[in-house]
Amino acid sequence: ARQAASLYAATRASIQQREFERARTLLARLADVTRSDPAAARQARLLSAELELAAGNPQRTLEILAGSPPQRPELVLQTQARLQASKGPDMTNALQTWLATHPRDATVWQLLAATYRQNQQPLRAVRAEAEAQVAHLDYGAALDRFRAGQELVRQGGASASDHVEASIIDTRAREVQAVLKEQAAER
């Protein structure tokens, strides 16, 4: 376990220093050490995916993650890889499904915003950015983003199919405004 921890830390440091060949060498050793422990092997596989993503190899990242159970780390890495490969919109449904049961996951809201932007859906992207701020409990920033969405609709920057999204933005803006008023009253 100690050797695995040391190899993991050394690999992560090499990735951060952008020494990808050294990281791959360390990762191969880590894979050997963790082979008999499924949980540790999963962590090594996730680190391998992170390495390839950092090295600019999104397709290799997706290959490493293929067949992995749909847990949050895999979802985040797959989305980042698809965004890097300009295929972010492929992950929209999976991200929305995750957020239906984990609405306070700011990272996933930000990834959803990026997929919407890549798919030329600015109003949805602004709403997702606002929801990320709500998840961070930064209601002031969230209200700013919701207002930006309302302004986008007023300026005609939203498509006709965005009517439902505009309604959601209006409702969420009112809810966030109410929270801000409550917080101000408590002070």
Which residues are covered by each model-predicted region?
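Structural register within alpha-helical repeat arrays
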Residues: A10, S48, Q78-R82, L112, ...
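Residue at a conserved register position within TPR or TPR-like alpha-solenoid repeats
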Residues: S14, E52, R82-Q84, Y116, ...
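Alpha-helical adaptor scaffolds
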Residues: L46-G56, L62-Q120
